[in-house]
Amino acid sequence: MNASNWSLYLILCENSAFYCGISPNPQQRLAAHTAGKGAKYTRVFKPVAMRIVAGGMDKGTALRQEIAVKKLTAAQKRKLWEQAEKMPSET
């Protein structure tokens, strides 16, 4: 596995909130969240859509970015969502 293939993603949940996470394979991670095998939060509030915020990072950088995004306000996350790369299933 390439050390610089980690992505930071946002999931829009059915309650209109955003869930932030990292993965070396975001498409596979979305499938896990959708199947109820992801985070507890996405088991309760089902995913509606996912967007990639940033990619091509090593795991440490991705973790630091995730922490920073989780500290943002809902409005700031919404803006980040609007600027993020759409997943193929969303286009």
Swiss-Prot record:
PROSITE patterns reported for this sequence: GIY_YIG
Name the UniProt record assigns to this protein: UPF0213 protein NMA2126
Lineage of source species: Bacteria, Pseudomonadati, Pseudomonadota, Betaproteobacteria, Neisseriales
Domain of life: Bacteria
Gene3D superfamilies: GIY-YIG endonuclease
Annotated GIY-YIG domain residues: 4-83
Family recorded in the similarity comment: Belongs to the UPF0213 family.
Positions of transmembrane segments: none
